[in-house]
Amino acid sequence: MARVTVEDCIDKVDNRFDLVLLAAHRARMISSGSQLTIDRDNDKNPVVSLREIAEQTISPEDMREELVHSLQKFVEVDEPEPDTVPLIGSAGASVDADDTEVAVERMTEEELLKGLEGLAPREEQPEEDE
């Protein structure tokens, strides 16, 4: 079994901390069933991942991209803004392109309270027999 050290891999990945992150991510991928790019030689997954990086059978940039993708919880999707949004500086100016009006219904405080009471479940009072 050949000993793989950080010095063997540091010329492939500049930062040793990034190297550890990439090797750990690759070791987890191997544990979850990813194909090996080199012979295992009875080595454990972290050693195999370091050997893959040292022998350049995997691309560190691809590994970095996969690592970032695996850590993302939410993917941002750029949605187009509607064309009718007025600019901040032109608050007093009118938009002539589209004359859509939004009707806003005003509610009194009493109507709002009645509506909220209808949404809340009633608490039942336990009946006590004496």
Swiss-Prot record:
<feature type="region of interest" description="Disordered">
    <location>
        <begin position="80"/>
        <end position="99"/>
    </location>
</feature>
<comment type="similarity">
    <text>Belongs to the RNA polymerase subunit omega family.</text>
</comment>
<dbReference type="Pfam" id="PF01192">
    <property type="entry name" value="RNA_pol_Rpb6"/>
</dbReference>
<comment type="function">
    <text>Promotes RNA polymerase assembly. Latches the N- and C-terminal regions of the beta' subunit thereby facilitating its interaction with the beta and alpha subunits.</text>
</comment>
<dbReference type="GO" id="GO:0000428">
    <property type="term" value="C:DNA-directed RNA polymerase complex"/>
</dbReference>
<feature type="region of interest" description="Disordered">
    <location>
        <begin position="110"/>
        <end position="130"/>
    </location>
</feature>
<protein>
    <recommendedName>
        <fullName>DNA-directed RNA polymerase subunit omega</fullName>
        <ecNumber>2.7.7.6</ecNumber>
    </recommendedName>
</protein>
<keyword id="KW-0548">Nucleotidyltransferase</keyword>
<keyword id="KW-0808">Transferase</keyword>
<comment type="subunit">
    <text>The RNAP catalytic core consists of 2 alpha, 1 beta, 1 beta' and 1 omega subunit. When a sigma factor is associated with the core the holoenzyme is formed, which can initiate transcription.</text>
</comment>
<dbReference type="GO" id="GO:0003677">
    <property type="term" value="F:DNA binding"/>
</dbReference>
<dbReference type="GO" id="GO:0003899">
    <property type="term" value="F:DNA-directed RNA polymerase activity"/>
</dbReference>
<feature type="compositionally biased region" description="Basic and acidic residues">
    <location>
        <begin position="110"/>
        <end position="124"/>
    </location>
</feature>
<keyword id="KW-0240">DNA-directed RNA polymerase</keyword>
<dbReference type="InterPro" id="IPR006110">
    <property type="entry name" value="Pol_omega/Rpo6/RPB6"/>
</dbReference>
<dbReference type="GO" id="GO:0006351">
    <property type="term" value="P:DNA-templated transcription"/>
</dbReference>
<dbReference type="InterPro" id="IPR003716">
    <property type="entry name" value="DNA-dir_RNA_pol_omega"/>
</dbReference>
<keyword id="KW-0804">Transcription</keyword>
<dbReference type="InterPro" id="IPR036161">
    <property type="entry name" value="RPB6/omega-like_sf"/>
</dbReference>
